[in-house]
Design a protein with these regions (language model features):
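Well-ordered secondary-structure scaffolds
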Residues: 1-272
Length: 272
């Protein structure tokens, strides 16, 4: 049986799913854009697009330039990641499942015929129409649930509450320009501390806490672009360097959906 799963996106939430499926014995191929913009970079396999190779919780991902390089990575226990914005891998690499984990809040071109089993994470997908199932990505009671009909909860634009803070903990650019980071992931910051600049415009910490994520230095950003994330829980600095509870819950939903699909195939009930 084919054990290959193609995953669109290598950001921090996608990384939870990628890591989970890899550890469960699936061969995972990650598709990314040329210059990813993850801010929780210490736990995002997408960083391999810049550094060539990255490691999250002991699992390595390696940038490749040809689909033919995937097998060598899998044999070495490494996750291959390639620049493939149009998902050409769907035609080039035999696989049984496709997961759109870009968390773009919209469909970037995923269709239900891209694999035997197609999963979409978060809003932007309709189960039974452009994907087989959707996984809920909004914090709360339904996080990680499998949706077989309809869509995930719509994006509100308001971050989930952590330590009593919601929108205050996520920082967006006030102007377009080139991002220049000053603080680093894991730094303890105070409200009002200078943590970055966009061109010459200063970016200040919005609350006291741990800088959980900050955009890669030197990237151009538009106005109102997400550039940093502060965790108000000062005692949990190590969380900056491990896959989040949210990412793990989503990963559990994806794994459960795939296991259900495989069981249905064995019993003759699944779509082939």
């Amino acid at each position: 049986m084919n054990k290959t799963i193609i995953i669109r996106g290598g950001g921090d939430l996608a990384t939870g799913t990628i890591s989970c499926l890899h550890q469960c014995g699936y061969q995972v191929l990650v598709l990314e854009i040329a210059k990813p913009t993850a801010i929780r970079r210490s736990v995002a396999f997408s960083e391999a697009m810049y550094d060539g190779e990255t490691e999250v919780e002991g699992i390595k991902a390696r940038k490749i330039t040809q689909f033919s390089e995937t097998k060598a990575c899998w044999q070495d226990g490494i996750i291959p990641i390639i620049c493939d914005e149009k998902a050409e891998a769907v035609k080039a690499v035999p696989h049984f499942a496709f997961v759109d984990a870009a968390i773009a809040k919209r469909n970037l071109g995923t269709t239900i015929d891209m694999a035997d089993y197609v999963i979409g994470l978060g809003p932007g997908f309709t189960a039974g129409v452009d994907v087989d199932v959707v996984i809920e990505t909004k914090r709360g009671h339904r996080l990680g649930r499998i949706i077989r009909e309809g869509q995930a909860i719509a994006n509100t634009g308001i971050p989930g509450i952590i330590g009593g803070y919601g929108k205050e903990r996520v920082i967006h650019s006030e102007n377009a320009g080139v991002f220049h980071g000053i603080a680093h992931i894991g730094d303890l910051v105070k409200k009002g501390d200078l943590i970055a600049k966009v061109d010459d415009a200063p970016v200040y910490a919005t609350l006291d806490g741990v800088l959980r994520g900050i955009l890669r230095d030197g990237l151009p950003v538009p106005e109102h672009f997400k550039i940093a994330d502060i965790d108000p829980r000062l005692s949990e600095r190590e969380n900056c360097f491990t896959i989040s509870d949210k990412a793990s819950a989503i990963a559990g939903g994806v794994l459960r959906a795939i296991c259900i699909y495989e069981n249905e195939l064995r019993s003759g009930e699944g779509r082939k």
